Amino acid sequence: MKYRINFNLFLFILLIGIIIFSLFYGAVRVPVSDVIKIILNKTGLFNYEISKQSYIPIVFFVRFPRIMVAVIVGGALALCGCTMQSLLKNPIVDSGIIGISSGASLGAVIAVSLGLTVTSIFIMPLFSGAFALIISAIIYKISTLRGRTDNLLLILSGIAISSFVGAITSVILTSLAETEMKEYIFWAMGSLNGRRWEHFFFGLIPVVILSPILFYYGKELNILLLGEEEAKSLGINIKKIRGKILIIIALLTAISVCISGNITFVGLIVPHILRKLIGSDNRKLLKSSFLAGACFLTFSDLLSRIVLAPKEISVGIITAFIGAPYFIYLIIKIRKEGKILWKIL
């Protein structure tokens, strides 16, 4: 217990440090003292003098909301990836395997093609979120036989349906005008640029409500890792728990994808690294994954802003640059050790 608390406390302090550094560092460097004063002034309890008034919109309306979006999205993606890996007993899958990313992409491109994105900033998130849930439901239904969800069938169904949906998305893309194409591509690459407080609060409520539910199922996930027969003997309703967990994963990932675009590898590499550090006990791993995922995406967003400053790289490109080499290393390691992916957890 002490180790877990200390490790999570370390992650929390690290996250606060990254947030503060991200607020003052960028194309325009804002003194740390001014950053703190701006935040305190916004509480309405203080009225400190800021050295430059131009710092206020930069810190509070440009950087702060996108950073907070990175916190909830990174945390949610890592939490869902960790849960999915434990549920399927496979360390190289994440929540995207159940079709959420492909469904969200289809919803986004439909919204853009219909010209609806100019009416509200929430149109694309709503369309992408709705289609993500629909495609996830279809994949879950296909992979369920006689009331039982087969892990391998779920993965294969996810790959097949995602490929089909991706083909439909590509067909629609060919009919888009150049400006519409750019709008979709920028979203699809995964970007936090232009995220406002509205986006943060749009995602905050479901993340705050649903994440603790997954934390609660840590014990049940540990039991499921022992095998279905053992789980049944211990009184676990496998169908009910698995269904609830998959629904929560679909909702959390859909919310994350629809407000940030397709950001890859967060849900894959963060839980895997943590397993090496603190073990596979989901009761502590799930909470640590949320905090570590928030740290990872917030830091990646900082890199996306400063690597080619004043130009900006999509944060999805940064996570891919970091995550892809590690993923390749992981596959090579598993291959050398001769392990079977569905048996190694």
Specify the residue positions occupied by each region the protein language model found.
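Alpha-helical transmembrane segments in inner-membrane proteins
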Residues: 1-345
